[in-house]
Amino acid sequence: MKTPSQTHVLGLAHPPLPMVRLAFIGLGNRGVLTLQRYLQIEGVEIKALCEIREGNLVKAQKILREAGYPQPDGYTGPDGWKRMCERDDIDLVFICTDWLTHTPMAVYSMEHGKHVAIEVPAAMTVEECWKLVDTAEKTRQHCMMLENCCYDPFALTTLNMAQQGAFGEITHVEGAYIHDLRSIYFADESKGGFHNHWGKKYSIEHTGNPYPTHGLGPVCQILNIHRGDRMNYLVSLSSLQAGMTEYARKNFGADSPEARQKYLLGDMNTTLIQTVKGKSIMIQYNVVTPRPYSRLHTVCGTKGFAQKYPVPSIALEPDAGSPLEGKALEEIMERYKHPFTATFGTEAHRRNLPNEMNYVMDCRLIYCLRNGLPLDMDVYDAAEWSCITELSEQSVLNGSIPVEIPDFTRGAWKKCHISRTSDLY
């Protein structure tokens, strides 16, 4: 609930931090990968690690020692993360735990004077989204969701093109998370799988789109959501569920517990969103059918079109009927190459790092904190993109009725016209 003295945090900036002191909660697969990434980033000091499974904590500490870094303090147990967040020598807490613990950990961290960087999605319910917003506004701490797809080179190029007017007035965008994860869902956790995993459990109990942010984040940035426009309402529809059951029958037998398991989540979810200014957004989710990986990333405007999947494609007037190919496509990509790609992305290639998106996101986050700049993604992004999980489920369960999307800025979106990232480098 908003207090009388509470104001928005659009454009929030803090004094520069010469050295950013980090702590990590959660050292499973994703958490360890994040920790290892930050060994490549200048201007950071890893102060503390927390993991409920002590074996994972010991392995993470060993990684740092073997890389030549001081061993950070370790915390474990059900309340270890709280004790770590209560320290006064930490600037930024990374939260790489299961979905259901993201919000309470972020809220506690901010209440104890820490900036937070949360793995996706930042929250699972609208109530949790409001908790993140209210806490960030009351504490004046940064709250960033780690949506790495916003730093994809093609996404950044199309963002730059949109900001320079190359697409004309943008009327429609599309995003998705389409990724065949069936083999992972049924693999044992010791082999990196999701068998008996919280993510699989969610698909048994819920429908809608549980993982909207990879597709939604980049296209919301292109539309300048909550910076002159906002998402107004959505309608959502899910197909029947068949993919998980068929896979289980084939691999475990028709009478196996895996094949008899019921899932509420349909194979394909499609969610349509309209903004206050009348622009449309389509977001899809499908992780259980045999098809190539795709996030779509489609941009449609009055002067041109772009789409990353299945192959990068850009078409501009006066020849928009045919996509640019070969050298012509390379030239337009180079012409509109985003400064983040030109700097941090080039550095990632030079150092032969495995994931350019992650490296650019990491460098950019630390760069902003060390230079006292607003972050590229704020708490309103985290709330707006994450709330689609619950709202899409509400729509699906009620015959695809329209569901209103909250204005987490409480009207401040009308007054903020800062172009995303364009004024921050």
Curated annotation (Swiss-Prot):
Entry-linked SUPFAM superfamilies: NAD(P)-binding Rossmann-fold domains
Record keywords: Glycosidase, Hydrolase, NAD
Residues that bind NAD(+): 29-30, 51, 99-102, 119-120, 148, 194-198, 211
A UniProt-annotated Pfam family: Glyco_hydro_109_C
Domain of life: Bacteria
EC number: 3.2.1.-
Cofactor note text: Binds 1 NAD(+) per subunit. The NAD(+) cannot dissociate.
Cofactor: NAD(+)
GO molecular function: hydrolase activity, acting on glycosyl bonds; nucleotide binding
Binding site for substrate: Y177, Y211, P212, T213, H214, Y293
Similarity comment: family membership: Belongs to the Gfo/Idh/MocA family. Glycosyl hydrolase 109 subfamily.
Function: Glycosidase.
Name under which the protein is recorded: Glycosyl hydrolase family 109 protein 2
Upper classification of the organism: Bacteria, Pseudomonadati, Bacteroidota, Bacteroidia, Bacteroidales
